[in-house]
Structures are given as C-alpha cells and as structure tokens.
Amino acid sequence: MARRIRQWIGFLIMLAGLGLLAGPFLLGAREEKVQEQVVDTFYQDVKKAETEPAANETETREPQDPFYQAAKAYNESLLNGGQSAMTSRADVEQFALSAQDYGVSENVIGTIRIPRMEIELGLYLGANSENMAKGAAIFGMTSLPLGRESENAAIAGHRGWRGAPMFREIQKLQIDDPIYVTTPWQTLVYRVCEIRIVTPEDNSWCRIQPGRTLISLMTCHPYGQNYQRYIVFAELSPEDKPSEEAIRAENAASYDPSPRQITQIHADGTSDTVTVDPAAIRPDGSEYGAVLSNFVILAEDKMRIAAWIGAAVVALSGIWLTVQTLRDFKKGEKHHESE
C-alpha cells in the first residue's frame, strides 16, 4: 500500500510539473487569441459601417463621418497648443475621444501591423494598463493617425506581455521597414525613418513635428527591464498598401541582420551612439547580454515544443505507473489467494 501511495504521489508531482511547464505557453496563446479577436472585431465594425452608410455620406466617407471629424478636430487642437498641457503620466493614460461613442465595439481606432515583427495589434485610445494589456495604445495628448500633415501618433506597447510578443522584438526594425496602420477610413503606410533610445522622463519624441506625418513606437528597454525607452519613428509614405505576397517578399528580401548604430539620449541632454544587435534583444554591450536574452527568447518561443515534450513524458510516466500499479495489485491478489 505504501509503495502504491508513493507512486501516485510521484504521478501527481509530474502532473504539477507539466502544469508549470505548459502554463506560460497556454497563457501566451490565450493572450494572442484575445489580441486576434480585438483585431477581428475592429474589422467587423468597419465592414458593418461600410454596409450601412449615413444618408448624407459620399463615397469617401471621411468628410461626413462624425468619428473622422471628431478625430480631425482633436488633432487640430493639439497642433494649436494642446500638447503643452502634457506634464504627467495621467495625461497619456486617458484620451479625449472614445471610439465606442462612434460605434466601435472597444475603444479601438484601428490596428497596427508590423511585418518585420510578425504582429498585428489593436490600437487603443489611451496608454493605460488595461489597454496595453490587450494591444498597442496611443498616448493621450498625441495625434491620431489620420495621414494628415503635422501629426505624431505616439504608440506604446509592452515588451512582451504574459507570453504574447507585442513589441518584444522591436529591435529587428530597421530604416525603411514598412508599418501599416488601418483606421475605419483607410490603411496608411509608414516607413521607419529614425530610431532612438531615451530616458523614461523624455517625452520630446512624442511631440508633433510641424510639417511631418509620423507615428512613434515606444516600448521599455532593455528587454526585461525598464530604465530606458526604445523609440522608432516612422513617416507616412505616399504608397498604397501592397498585396500580401509583396509584403512577404519585401520582408524576406530586405532584412539586414547586422548590428545597428542607434542614438542614445541621456537625461542631461547629451547623446552618444550604441550598438544594437537585432538578434539579441539586450543591447547593453555586456558580454552576457546577447546570450542571456537569446536564451530567454528561445525559452519563450520554444514553449510549445517544451509543453508537448513535457506532456509526452508525463503521459508515458502515467502509463508506466498505471502498469506498475496493476502489477502490484495482481501480485497482491495472488499473494492473498496463496494464503
């Protein structure tokens, strides 16, 4: 009896180990599914709006669309001095507009797709913790991406969240990489034009640059830490969104895996240049940085394989324990019969 109890205890311990092993993968898969649902819901809302046009609406929707007009007026208010009030974290967490007031299921104005990083996320209004747990988020008191002159939409994303990649591999982005932003009115193509590393207190990067049409991606840096911010600027390109085949072809052909030279701006305003290896998401220059970061990435990316291996080990162990238990049971019966 004692032996059988030990066997079942061992079996339960292995099941618990499998749960610990598979847990991060399952959580990550769940988070990615939630993000996919947000994107799908946005496209469904847009499709519904297109099939139910307003009575006074023209073919282009934009001039008469109330949401667009509100977004346009909001951007103009920022250009006329509205960003001067941006002084605290609370200012970027809230947003003056709500997409839900204009028929969008969640407070999402669109999606952002980055082929180099293999992600597409919902674009929430307001960079608060709730929104950033579900996708990318536009800072309050920064522009909405309408494709008009003198805009800078500051878009924040976690450097990975509960197993979902989000902006984790932002260091793979290189100059001229495309970024696609889809709103209820159009899909805009932006091209990466500059990359910086700044301090958390520096908010100059999210300010409007008159005459330029920008989006600015922001995430914590280095990976796994948050004492800096990694900023990627992308400028509006006049091109139309290409076909999926063309997107994949450009993504495969244009990648440069060599280290990048990135401008780093310090708290005192001075700057220098640091080397960032896109294959290693810790660019601090330490000897262990690349090895450590790549191990973390490998562990995260290979969690699916590890989960299956763990499941197989536990399944085989369970079968073996079951067989051993049955054998012991039969031996016990034979022993009683012989007595």
Residue ranges and their predicted role:
Residues 302-326:
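Selective detector of the "anchor" transmembrane alpha-helix that sits immediately C-terminal
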Residues 337-339:
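Solvent-exposed, low-complexity, intrinsically disordered
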Residues 2-301, 321-335:
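Solvent-exposed, non-transmembrane regions of membrane-associated and secreted proteins
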